[in-house]
Amino acid sequence: MPLSSPNAAATASDMDKNSGSNSSSASSGSSKGQQPPRSASAGPAGESKPKSDGKNSSGSKRYNRKRELSYPKNESFNNQSRRSSSQKSKTFNKMPPQRGGGSSKLFSSSFNGGRRDEVAEAQRAEFSPAQFSGPKKINLNHLLNFTFEPRGQTGHFEGSGHGSWGKRNKWGHKPFNKELFLQANCQFVVSEDQDYTAHFADPDTLVNWDFVEQVRICSHEVPSCPICLYPPTAAKITRCGHIFCWACILHYLSLSEKTWSKCPICYSSVHKKDLKSVVATESHQYVVGDTITMQLMKREKGVLVALPKSKWMNVDHPIHLGDEQHSQYSKLLLASKEQVLHRVVLEEKVALEQQLAEEKHTPESCFIEAAIQELKTREEALSGLAGSRREVTGVVAALEQLVLMAPLAKESVFQPRKGVLEYLSAFDEETTEVCSLDTPSRPLALPLVEEEEAVSEPEPEGLPEACDDLELADDNLKEGTICTESSQQEPITKSGFTRLSSSPCYYFYQAEDGQHMFLHPVNVRCLVREYGSLERSPEKISATVVEIAGYSMSEDVRQRHRYLSHLPLTCEFSICELALQPPVVSKETLEMFSDDIEKRKRQRQKKAREERRRERRIEIEENKKQGKYPEVHIPLENLQQFPAFNSYTCSSDSALGPTSTEGHGALSISPLSRSPGSHADFLLTPLSPTASQGSPSFCVGSLEEDSPFPSFAQMLRVGKAKADVWPKTAPKKDENSLVPPAPVDSDGESDNSDRVPVPSFQNSFSQAIEAAFMKLDTPATSDPLSEEKGGKKRKKQKQKLLFSTSVVHTK
């Protein structure tokens, strides 16, 4: 062991004196070169040279004593801890530790567990082994055999150049936006004093949350408050889309010292001012086998509102809240202040007052009263705005009339002074005729402008109309004639002018109750073949649901289904295939599309099989984790390999007994030759159906006496005189022959599809061996006859190959 330097010994003694320990004797002994044995109770000798790790031992020998003097004797404790901690890393500094001795003694004592005083104990706590065990956060996903990537992140290389491709990858998952999903799948009642032109031009434009007065949700089940687990009273919805009772969410927000709190479901920020009124309506959830009614819808190209063909109208302005016929087909419903007061605020007020009467003596009553107070504030604001709005509306209307009438009167005065008097006088006659058809009291200048616009309208529309026709034809080819063009002219409008051409329209079938369920293209092609186009198809059809496929609107889906381009992104919809029957479509039409219908049927069956197999595999894996393993299934259908005792003893049609002991395997009374459960089943059920027809019933005592098989003693008494004791019966095909397995697939499932199942190796191997033995047994029965007739010895036959696993035989 190398000796410690005097400097190290002196420094160590100084540290011991400061800490109040008595280690002077150990220090003197160490300076003489004698290393005393170290006991378990005493601390490690700090005077000795500190042992470095295996990594540092070779590096420390490179330096001599002259190198030691270059280091300062007294270095701060933090620098030593930093150097010591860096030695455990992969790229540690191979410089030897400081020869100071004091800190090295503390470092060694922290790992060897020696007793220290209180001063050293406080310093040693900083050198805990956890400080050198690597990072504090350890990924243990490999122990769970499970990996999870957060949704919306396409790559792990954030902030580096290596992950740039993942961000540009168009096949990656798009980040999920809660607000976009909420606004795509809900209907909003908004205040009418705002401009919503952009929302009727682009379906993906988000509605300003401050303009929302009420949110309407259509779901298959009534939501419940996640706090009280009851149907929400005076329900409020957050911006993240979660619904709560108004009193419950106020109670939850009051628990936080901040003005906002995290959502108890998704941990998004929830502000009190962002809570909006919500109404949830329950809709019927259609499943396979239900009868659904779909109606024919019509939508002009470029318009985002699709209406039933029977109720179709030009959607020139947004639909208001009071329009009950068309309100379910629009995303935005404009409401006035009076409508918000009567249809939103008053309903919540009644619900809160009823809840307060029921829970007046509960701790929740204070939050119900707070909700009522906030509702009164909202009511006062709406009523005040409504009163002031009436006054402002009257003033604005008067100003608009003054502004509009002044230039019109001025224009009518200066029109006769224009240069081309002949054209104006000739055009004036037509203007007066048209005006006489409408209202004679209207000014002459206003119809003049409208007439000029109407006359000049067809000229620039010629080229766009042709382009629309070509684009529409492409849509029909891609979508199986989903949409058709409306070529008929519109009737005369109120102003007396006719629209010479109309834009193309999309026709499609949607669920009658307004759900986003649309007809499958296969059914659409059947209807187009039957009626010529969807425009001439029935307005409503009813049929049985065969398949429902759910989708979420994306850019790719929007390009494939252009007739659904009015749906916003992330909007959920479903394509429904129906079993159309006469009289909706004729039998000839169904026969024409029978191949497509059968193909889709086989695809559904295949998908169902794969799902069942997957469920079975998952169930087996889960059972294996719990120590439950599947039972071994041994097929006992072959009666020759597994003979049953009942089947031979209870047959009354022929004599009982085996055919031969060599060929087909003789049936003996020994229990070893029977199947395991045949004897027990026979004893437990002596009155079987086969035995009751005339065969004698057996019991335990008379089994040996009444048995038709001769015993061994009887065979000895008879001797060789009567050798042919066993009666020979013709082998039955249903007992001795191989029973072909049922036409099932490898998993034991069958269907009417044309798929050929893969044979099991176990069954094919056993059947091949048994068939080979049967072939050998067949000529053995004819040997006595050939010997009697010919009297000659048979020639030695060549050996036959029983079974071979190889496919190609080469010499």
Swiss-Prot record:
GO terms for biological process: negative regulation of Schwann cell proliferation; positive regulation of DNA-templated transcription; positive regulation of myelination; positive regulation of transcription by RNA polymerase II; postsynapse to nucleus signaling pathway; protein autoubiquitination; protein monoubiquitination; ribosome-associated ubiquitin-dependent protein catabolic process. It catalyses: S-ubiquitinyl-[E2 ubiquitin-conjugating enzyme]-L-cysteine + [acceptor protein]-L-lysine = [E2 ubiquitin-conjugating enzyme]-L-cysteine + N(6)-ubiquitinyl-[acceptor protein]-L-lysine. Its EC number is 2.3.2.27. Residues 724-736 have a biased composition (Basic and acidic residues). Keywords: Cytoplasm, DNA-binding, Metal-binding, Nucleus, Phosphoprotein, Transcription, Transcription regulation, Transferase, Ubl conjugation pathway, Zinc, Zinc-finger. It is found in: Cytoplasm; Nucleus. Residues 1-119, 653-672, 724-761, 776-811 are annotated as: Disordered. E3 ubiquitin-protein ligase that catalyzes monoubiquitination of 40S ribosomal proteins RPS2/us5 and RPS3/us3 in response to ribosome stalling. Part of a ribosome quality control that takes place when ribosomes have stalled during translation initiation (iRQC): RNF10 acts by mediating monoubiquitination of RPS2/us5 and RPS3/us3, promoting their degradation by the proteasome. Also promotes ubiquitination of 40S ribosomal proteins in response to ribosome stalling during translation elongation. The action of RNF10 in iRQC is counteracted by USP10. This is E3 ubiquitin-protein ligase RNF10. Belongs to the RNF10 family. It comes from Homo sapiens. The gene is RNF10. GO terms for molecular function: transcription cis-regulatory region binding; ubiquitin protein ligase activity; zinc ion binding. It is an enzyme of class 2 (transferase).
